[in-house]
């Protein structure tokens, strides 16, 4: 069986590499034509795709997947409509491929500049969310990359149904059908082959929990753009406008639980904790959010608040649970975030401009927010159209990874017969 999986993955890799050589020089109009044809195919096959998703949902329930995973897995008509809108947004994006920047003459008379080019073949490993299949496929096509998608086994039927529509659209436009491939096996050995096929794959994008990220980081022979978990914080500073702080901290936690940009720890300055905490605790109680607090939080709110452990400060709950800590000021808040956070998205609520700038400079996260919800950390909200993930790395791409994150630059040299003396 291992041999057959290896042969299957080698074939997928070769097909992706061949497709990437065509895509790299495909015109913007041709790529947009393919994306428009995919849009039509998805519209025409909505019922079949939603039916496939229901098969996955039923399996998920029978396998006792937790509520956060089931929420990520489910494709409702409204979410399907959102997927289609996201595809429209990608079509409308400016194509970065071929863009020449920093063109300048050198004393020798040659011109030096940089041209934006595709990465080549992207391998993506992710869990649960079928909408990621379409987002990743559309961004790859628009940026001239082939992509190999390995979704979670819990979403296999949904991903296969979406991939069929994508394949149809590519065929209509005359682009290689293997520009986008979904791995159609749940065998974990496929991941091992994908992350070591350096001759076929140029970059790996893992999007999932710590165990997945650790495995890919340890075993990959290919550059990795990591999408790690989102242990996000909001710090309500002493000079915060509480009329802003209340809706921000409520939205950051309760707008949607099972997403990586939801707040998991609330930090409150000790100077306003006595006033702020009872108000926000009342709002959380209405949403049935369980609070786990430090000793000072429990003194203010009462012992019905569970005591927070060291593990709680590190935890991405992806559910209606929130860790709460009262801090002495901005220094303790920043130290806490940089120690326990996942470098994803962290926010401050304050009316003090100097402290806001200090927070922006010192918090080591891919997105740092002032006076707004962490839920804005999203490719669509950032104007990227869609995202392939949110990178917590510092090299190549950081934060929401859109079209530009799937490209690199090469130097170009323009001469008129010059030779080096």
Curated annotation (Swiss-Prot):
Gene3D superfamilies: Aldehyde Dehydrogenase, Chain A, domain 1, Aldehyde Dehydrogenase, Chain A, domain 2. The keyword Amino-acid biosynthesis applies. Keywords: Amino-acid biosynthesis, Cytoplasm, NADP, Oxidoreductase, Proline biosynthesis. It comes from the Bacteria. Pathway: Amino-acid biosynthesis; L-proline biosynthesis; L-glutamate 5-semialdehyde from L-glutamate: step 2/2. GO terms for molecular function: glutamate-5-semialdehyde dehydrogenase activity; NADP binding. It is found in: Cytoplasm. CDD domains: ALDH_F18-19_ProA-GPR. It is an enzyme of class 1 (oxidoreductase). Its main location: cytoplasm. Pfam families: Aldedh (PF00171). InterPro entries: Ald_DH/histidinol_DH, Ald_DH_C, Ald_DH_N, Aldehyde_DH_dom, G-glutamylP_reductase_CS, Glu-5-SA_DH, GPR_dom. Catalyzes the NADPH-dependent reduction of L-glutamate 5-phosphate into L-glutamate 5-semialdehyde and phosphate. The product spontaneously undergoes cyclization to form 1-pyrroline-5-carboxylate. This is Gamma-glutamyl phosphate reductase. It comes from Acinetobacter baumannii (strain ACICU).
């Amino acid at each position: 069986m291992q041999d057959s999986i290896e042969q299957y993955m080698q074939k997928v890799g070769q097909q992706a590499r061949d497709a990437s050589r065509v895509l790299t020089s495909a015109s913007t109009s041709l790529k947009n034509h393919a994306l428009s044809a995919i849009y039509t195919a998805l519209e025409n096959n909505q019922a079949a795709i939603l039916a496939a998703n229901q098969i996955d949902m039923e399996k998920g329930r029978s396998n006792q997947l937790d509520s956060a995973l089931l929420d990520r897995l489910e494709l409702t008509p409204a979410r399907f409509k959102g997927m289609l809108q996201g595809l429209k947004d990608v079509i409308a994006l400016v194509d970065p491929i071929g863009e020449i920047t920093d063109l300048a003459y050198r004393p020798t008379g040659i011109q030096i500049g940089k041209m934006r080019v595709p990465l080549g073949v992207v391998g993506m490993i992710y869990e649960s969310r079928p909408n990621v299949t379409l987002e990743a496929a559309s961004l790859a096509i628009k940026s001239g990359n082939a992509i190999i998608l390995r979704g979670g086994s819990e979403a296999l039927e949904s991903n296969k149904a979406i991939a069929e529509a994508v394949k149809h659209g590519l065929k209509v436009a005359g682009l290689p059908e293997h520009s986008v491939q979904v791995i159609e096996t749940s065998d974990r050995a496929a991941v091992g082959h994908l992350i070591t096929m350096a001759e076929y794959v140029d970059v790996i994008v893992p999007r999932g929990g710590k165990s997945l990220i650790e495995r890919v980081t340890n075993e990959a022979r290919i550059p990795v753009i990591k999408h790690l978990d989102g242990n996000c914080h909001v710090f309500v500073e002493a000079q915060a406008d509480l009329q802003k702080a209340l809706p921000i901290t409520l939205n950051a936690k309760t707008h949607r639980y099972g997403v990586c940009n939801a707040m998991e720890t609330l930090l409150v300055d000790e100077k306003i904790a006595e006033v702020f905490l009872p108000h926000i605790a009342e709002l959380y109680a209405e949403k049935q959010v369980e609070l786990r607090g430090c000793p000072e939080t429990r003194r203010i709110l009462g012992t019905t608040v569970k005591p927070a452990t060291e593990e709680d400060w590190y935890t991405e709950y992806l559910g209606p649970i929130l860790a709460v800590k009262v801090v002495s000021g901005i220094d303790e808040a920043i130290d806490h975030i940089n120690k326990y956070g996942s470098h994803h998205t962290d926010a401050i609520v304050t009316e003090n401009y100097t402290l806001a700038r200090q927070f922006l400079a010192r918090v080591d996260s891919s997105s740092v927010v002032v006076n707004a919800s962490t839920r804005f950390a999203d490719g669509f909200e950032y104007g990227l159209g869609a995202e392939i993930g949110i990178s917590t790395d510092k090299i190549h791409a950081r934060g929401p990874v859109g079209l530009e994150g799937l490209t690199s630059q090469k130097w170009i040299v323009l001469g008129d017969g010059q030779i080096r003396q």
